Amino acid sequence: PTITNDGVSIAKEIELEDPYEKIGAELVKEVAKKTDDVAGDGTTTATVLAQALVREGLRNVAAGANPLGLKRGIEKAVEKVTETLLKSAKEVETKDQIAATAAISAGDQSIGDLIAEAMDKVGNEGVITVEESNTFGLQLELTEGMRFDKG
């Protein structure tokens, strides 16, 4: 068995029989996947928020609320939250800040340090690929120019 706390990995494994529950599960899977595609992190938070929005939305509709009014309210709230987050966001600029941020995301300081080293070498416009290996330990490989693995 795989042990994980990653929202997108958990969401992918959800399979339900009830058609209505299945629709909700697919919605949560899509939220987790989009979050992973755009940000690469925060999938668990996005999954929990999506579940809360669905639960409370259905509760309000059952109590007589207008679904379109709820949708408009959620959209306004998203705008405000996005605005507030962008105001409080801080640039991650130094190698130490990059290492700390990467370590939190990876849950491992040595991986954070290696990612910071890779970022230092390739710059903000470079591409970093993380791959699993059959060997033990961490390794940084720098390829200048372009590399084609196949064909």
From Swiss-Prot:
It catalyses: ATP + H2O + a folded polypeptide = ADP + phosphate + an unfolded polypeptide. It comes from the Bacteria. It is found in: Cytoplasm. It holds the Pfam family Cpn60_TCP1. The keyword Transmembrane helix does not apply. SUPFAM superfamilies: GroEL equatorial domain-like (SSF48592). Keywords: ATP-binding, Chaperone, Cytoplasm, Isomerase, Nucleotide-binding, Stress response. ATP binds at D41, G42, T43, T44, T45. Belongs to the chaperonin (HSP60) family. Forms a cylinder of 14 subunits composed of two heptameric rings stacked back-to-back. Interacts with the co-chaperonin GroES. Together with its co-chaperonin GroES, plays an essential role in assisting protein folding. The GroEL-GroES system forms a nano-cage that allows encapsulation of the non-native substrate proteins and provides a physical environment optimized to promote and accelerate protein folding. This is Chaperonin GroEL.
